[in-house]
Amino acid sequence: MIEAIEQGYRYFGCGGALGFDTLAAQTVLRLREIYPEIRLILVLPCRDQTRGWKQADVAEYDRIMKAADKVTYTSEQYYSGCMHKRNRHLVDNSSLCICYLTEQSGGTAYTVNYARSQGLKIINIAE
């Protein structure tokens, strides 16, 4: 992310999911202390995304939401396609995709392939 910041990227969109999304958001928030010009934009699939999560994960999600510069919901309620809608929104409003892709199928692979098809630069930190 530091390389992206040094290249002039200022807005970092994140989907708010458990795992890499959480780590990415935490990293942006830490880096914002050093680079106060960067912004964290959470693009969330629905308002009840945390339903069924562990209490500690919900607490961290809430902390990240409060610290984010902007929070956008792509749907009010969960439905079977809301995660894809969120992912497409992230790609459609980005010029760079920082990901952790280890599998060639699934939601992350779909999103990275879509980003590639839209001409985004891809940085896969798993490589």
Regions found by a protein language model. Give the residues of each.
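Acidic/glycine-enriched connector segments
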Residues: 1-127
